[in-house]
Amino acid sequence: MTGAPTPTRWAGVPLTDRRAERRALLVDAAFRLFGDGGEAALSVRSVCRECGLNTRYFYESFADTDDLLGAVYDEVSAALAADVEAATAGAGDSLRARTRAGIAAVLGFSSADPRRGRVLFTDARAN
């Protein structure tokens, strides 16, 4: 039984796009693992297993798990900053209203997905 070879996951995807996609998969996997289980759940193998990539692709994007965790932190903090900026921009000119909107945005951001709070406020290594 000979058939045409099955296309690979990355067939037809340009190299730079493949790398970016794999990096995003690794960051998302690390977010889930760290967010659910803390730093103890994070290893090169666990991240690669979580996203279905081999370790070669891990080291294509990151030097070590500290580097990866920094990327997770950067992504989550950028999302928080965007939420706070949007909330404060829509709160009017009053400093009090803008402050309340910013605080509410931080609390809402963390409570909407508690893993975000864990990444930002607990367990995190110094990055």
Q: What feature does the model see in each segment?
A:
Residues 71, 85-115:
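Hydrophobic alpha-helical connector segments
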Residues 108, 115-127:
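Short secondary-structure transition hinges
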Residues 73-81:
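Short, basic, alpha-helical segments at the C-terminal edge of helix-turn-helix-like DNA-binding modules
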